[in-house]
């Protein structure tokens, strides 16, 4: 019976778990505390070391020693280094200046050999190079095709890709304006048209009047009505004129002066002048015969009236001149 009692005591101790579990938990807590103690000691030791290092750096700064900087070290700027820098900069500036002077001289020489050299209007660098390229291309085309460098195609090749002022300068220097175009058209006309233009192209220069175009008779004829020219053409060539176009007139902007006072500055003339009369000039026959031989359209037997040249100009004709005109038209 005693043995069973002992067994019951042992079983009771085994069943009683909180006792031995408390012992195990207590041992684990002791181990953790032992492990955590050195960590706290290490943190404190590191803080004390940093504080000591900061104090040492402050002491070094107080002593005058600067801390070392990272990166490339800058050399001290001495007077010798400053002089070397200045001399190097002066040499670079002089080298760039001579280079630009040489480039400008070369461009000036290139402008002189271009077909549109002008002392007043200087082309820019890019325009000079473009014109030189077009000039070389146009000359090569002339050599290949054998055409003359005086046509319109040559100017078009020169002005390709250029600005409007440069194109105007090229056309002006080559003298290819509206007059040259008229000359090219004039070459294609028939000889009958040439003779017609030469007959009616009077060049009467009056002594006492200003320089052309006011002194020419062309300006007075051009302000006449188309019926007068029609009558002149029918009298010289018959009723049928050849198919030829006359060049457009580029006269002055100001109204022409009149010698005899037939053509006033007013646009609205008198009703008597609105009627169609045959044109009969009252200039002396000696002046016309000396200027041109062609005097067939004019009658030689008509009365002539000499008007003094040195009279003062008046926009409204006098009564005496009006009576002379009436007698001319009635006769």
From Swiss-Prot:
The keyword Phosphoprotein applies. GO terms for biological process: amacrine cell differentiation; axon development; camera-type eye development; cell fate commitment; motor neuron migration; neuroblast proliferation; Notch signaling pathway; oligodendrocyte differentiation. Residues 87-139 form the bHLH domain. Serine or threonine phosphorylation within the basic region may regulate neurogenic activity. Keywords: Activator, Developmental protein, Differentiation, DNA-binding, Neurogenesis, Nucleus, Phosphoprotein, Transcription, Transcription regulation. One of its GO terms (molecular function) is E-box binding. It is found in: Nucleus. Pfam families: HLH, Neuro_bHLH. Its main location: nucleus. InterPro entries: bHLH_dom (IPR011598), bHLH_transcription_factors (IPR050359), HLH_DNA-bd_sf (IPR036638), NeuroD_DUF (IPR022575), TF_bHLH_NeuroD (IPR016637). One of its GO terms (cellular component) is chromatin. Disulfide bonds: none annotated. This is Neurogenic differentiation factor 4. The lineage of its organism: Eukaryota, Metazoa, Chordata, Craniata, Vertebrata.
């Amino acid at each position: 019976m005693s043995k069973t009692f002992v067994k019951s005591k042992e079983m009771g101790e085994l069943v009683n778990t909180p006792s031995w579990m408390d012992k195990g938990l207590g041992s684990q807590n002791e181990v953790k505390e032992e492990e955590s103690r050195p960590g706290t000691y290490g943190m404190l030791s590191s803080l004390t070391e940093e504080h000591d290092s900061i104090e040492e750096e402050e002491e070094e700064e107080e002593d005058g020693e600067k801390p070392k900087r990272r990166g490339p070290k800058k050399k001290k700027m001495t007077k010798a280094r400053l002089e070397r820098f200045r001399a190097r900069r002066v040499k670079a500036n002089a080298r760039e200046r001579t280079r630009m002077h040489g480039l400008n001289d070369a461009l000036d020489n290139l402008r002189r050999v271009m077909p549109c050299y002008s002392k007043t209007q200087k082309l820019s660098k890019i325009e000079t190079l473009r014109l030189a390229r077009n000039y070389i291309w146009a000359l090569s085309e002339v050599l290949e095709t054998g055409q003359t460098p005086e046509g319109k195609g040559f100017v078009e090749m020169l002005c390709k890709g250029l600005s409007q002022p440069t194109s105007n300068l090229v056309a002006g220097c080559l003298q290819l304006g509206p007059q040259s175009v008229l000359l090219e058209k004039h070459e294609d006309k028939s000889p009958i048209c040439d003779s017609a233009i030469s007959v009616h192209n009077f060049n009467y220069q009056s002594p006492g009047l200003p320089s052309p175009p006011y002194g020419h008779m062309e300006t007075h004829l051009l302000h006449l009505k188309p019926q007068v020219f029609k009558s002149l053409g029918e009298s010289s060539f018959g009723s049928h004129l050849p198919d030829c176009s006359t060049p457009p007139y580029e006269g002055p902007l100001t109204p022409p002066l009149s010698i005899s006072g037939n053509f006033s500055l007013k646009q609205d003339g008198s009703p008597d002048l609105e009627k169609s009369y045959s044109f009969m000039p009252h200039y002396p026959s000696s002046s016309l015969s000396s200027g041109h031989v062609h005097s067939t359209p004019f009658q030689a037997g008509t009365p002539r009236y000499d008007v003094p040249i040195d009279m003062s100009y008046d926009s409204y004709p006098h009564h005496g001149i009006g009576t002379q005109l009436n007698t001319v038209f009635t006769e």
